[in-house]
Amino acid sequence: LMGAASQSTGYEINQSIRFSDNDSARLARTVSSSGSLTTWTLSGWIKRGRYTSNVNNQWFAVYTASAGSTAYDAPLNFNDAAAGGSFSVYLAGQNWRTTALARDTSAWYHVVTVWDSTNGTASDRMRLYVNGERQTDFSITGSVSSGLNSRWNSSSYSHHRIGNLNYN
C-alpha cells in the first residue's frame, strides 16, 4: 500500500491494514463475474484515524464503481464533521446516514451491512449493525424496492475498493 508503510502504530495487528489520510491509498479488486446483487453481507472491523471538519471528506469507504463514471455504491462510509461523524451507506441510488456518531479515534467498530432487497419487509432490505446493534435511527433514510439490484458484487462495476473514496 503506497504511503502506509512508513506509518508507525507502536504495535502490529495481524491481517490488518492502515491507510494514510494524506494520500489516495486503497485496496482494489477487479470483479470478473457478478455475485448476488440482491442479497449479500459485508462485515469488517474499522477504526477512525482522526476526526476532521473537512466538508467532503470520506475517511473510510468500501465502494464499487465503474471507471470513468460517477455511479458508485458505498456499503460503508465514515463521515466527516459536516455530517456529524456518522456512518453512512449509499446503495443503488439510495442513501442512509446514522444519527449514531463515530467520533472516537481510539475505538474499533465492528460494522455489518446487510443488503436483502428480496426481503418482504421493506425496512429490512438494508440493515446496518455497529458493534452488534442494529442501527434504526437515520437522519437520511433510503427506500429499497423489492428485488432492487445493488452495484456491489457486480462485474459491470468492476472496481471494488477499500480506502480512499475516489471513483474515477
Question: Where on the chain are the PLM-derived regions?
Answer:
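Extracellular glycan-associated modules
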Residues: 4-168
